[in-house]
Design a protein with these regions (language model features):
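A conserved regulatory-domain signal marking ACT and ACT-like small-molecule sensing domains
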Residues: 1-136
Length: 136
């Protein structure tokens, strides 16, 4: 059964060079920051776009300020479930019932668990959380 919660996703840009991600990971470890999600993509202008969901928002904000990352923040929905056939479809049906548009969705399955990060208009977050959690 899916469990959904609201999370803050931070987005920032780094240079796209060998070792930059490792350096960031080492700094995060030194600051004792745990990430629930990390996504990185190269851009055409020798930069990379990073998106992450930290376990503790305030701690990451302090880190980002000291590291001069200048992140933007957005509220996303993090859905986690044990793999049961049809959970993905049920979540999408819930989104459709509310006539909410998904701006982006990312998914990963590991060790019989599946997780999704759903980005949608902020006005839909609370109703989607309620509907996803009540549908189970």
């Amino acid at each position: 059964m899916p469990i959904a919660k609201s999370c803050t996703q931070f987005c920032f840009t780094l240079s796209d060079e060998p070792g930059v991600l490792l350096a960031l990971a080492n700094r995060l470890r030194a600051a004792d920051i745990t990430l629930l999600s990390l996504w990185a993509r190269s851009n055409e202008n020798q930069t990379s776009t990073m998106r992450c969901i930290p376990e503790r928002d305030a701690q990451f904000r302090d880190f980002a300020k000291s590291a001069e990352l200048k992140p933007c923040e957005e509220t996303v929905i993090h859905v986690n479930t044990r793999d049961h056939g049809g959970d993905f479809i049920r979540v999408l049906e819930t989104v459709a019932k509310l006539n909410a548009n998904i701006d982006a969705i990312e998914a990963v399955a590991l060790e019989n668990q599946t997780g999704w990060i759903i980005t949608t208009d902020k006005s839909h977050i609370d109703s989607l959380l309620t509907q996803i959690n009540d549908a189970t």
